[in-house]
Amino acid sequence: MVWRKWDGKEEIDLEGLSAVINLSGEAIDQRWTNKRKALFRKSRVDLTANLSRAIINSNVEVLLNASATGIYGDRGDEGLPEIASAGRGYLAELCRDWEDAVEVPENVRTVFLRTGVVLGKDSRAWEKMSKIFKWGIGGKLGSGRQWMPWIHLYDEVEGIVFCLENEIEGPVNLVAPESVRNAQFTKAVGKAIKRVTPFAAPAFGLKLLLGDFAKEGLLASARVVPQVLLDAGYEFKYPTIEKAMSEIVAN
């Protein structure tokens, strides 16, 4: 196994590799300015297109390419397995273009890793949100009724390995099997770290402060289902938010 950090500009040497896992993508957890949107696209769509061209001239047999559950858009209470259509909005279009940027020979087994919010002791998402809750100002976002696709870091990694080692192809939802609404998630975090969560961030305030990131990232509802992994026999170690929180806080 070889780890390579690549900005997508110069050519990449894939000699000797039979499989590639591409996890590139600039973090989207802040206000989406035009400058940042350009970075989002460059680090996802453009880099993936360049990688695809390199794979064409290589002996790579498997490509696992990052994507995100944002591809489904804001869908209310609709269940969203991998066969669900893409949604609308900037984030959904970005994710669709990201996946479409993969143009490799038909004999290259390709998997699109549609990942939700990754939770783990060292994950970026947990690092940012845990501070807010520990300060005693954590709370639900907007109405709190929006479904929040999430996954424990352990299952994120093991799920990727599972896709690599099994004949899985196409989109794969890397999310926990138990969906949670934002209000339920907030309650579980507060209970785990022994903090009350009386506050609620109003939707209008979040939109004013964070713009489209609030609208499409924090307040959008996506009840994503990991149907492909479940059908293939993957067993989640952390299927519930309560079990995930217990492990994270314990460590």
Give the predicted meaning of each segment.
Residues 49-89:
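Conserved Rossmann-fold NAD(P)-dependent oxidoreductase catalytic core, especially the SDR/UDP-sugar
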Residues 130-138, 145-180:
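Alpha-helical substrate-binding/gating segment
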Residues 159, 166-212, 246-251:
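Mid/C-terminal beta-alpha module of Rossmann-like enzyme folds, strongest
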Residues 67-68, 100-121:
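Conserved beta-loop-beta element that borders a ligand/cofactor-binding pocket
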Residues 1-50:
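NAD(P)H-binding glycine-rich loop region in Rossmannoid oxidoreductase-like domains
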Residues 20, 153-160, 174, 185, ...:
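Non-catalytic, hydrophobic alpha-helical segments
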Residues 86-89, 116-123, 143-153:
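Glycine-rich "substrate-gating" loop/helix at the edge of Rossmann-like oxidoreductase active sites
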